[in-house]
Amino acid sequence: MKLFHTSPSKIEKINSDGRFGEFLFFSGNVYTMTVAAPVVYSLELTDSDVIKASQLFYHEDAAKLTGLVAELAERLGVDEDTAEALIEESKSVYDIDSIEAEDAADVSWDVQLFTARAAKILGFRAVQVTDEQGAAWMVDMLGRESELTLQ
């Protein structure tokens, strides 16, 4: 599958700093999230590189996610069933009464990182998530800058 990432500037080096760590967001279509003319990259992935967020806890190695679920539960002050539901996208942060409305967007981004981390723990390169743009893919790009094709 061919996916696209747009950036406000040329990508020289990918690191694990920042909100989404080593994961970059990709879309099935070119999108713009910046006022400036974006730098557009494409990436080829196979279906076996990707797991859907909704399938994470159905994977045969889902028990490996126990620590990650506990970490999110503690961070958000929710039970582990709720944390799991957030990671697999069957529940939204907007459904959690203890999360203030003004914090919900930031928390939802934090949860997306946990979803990507879950996929990586299970041995996948990417996870398909749903966000305000529809289907999106969070792809582990650490050390893989050369795989980005400038469009």
Enumerate the language-model features and the residues they cover.
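Active-site and NAD+-binding cores of ADP-ribose-processing enzymes
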Residues: 1-23, 36-151
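GIY-YIG-like beta-to-alpha core
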Residues: 23-32
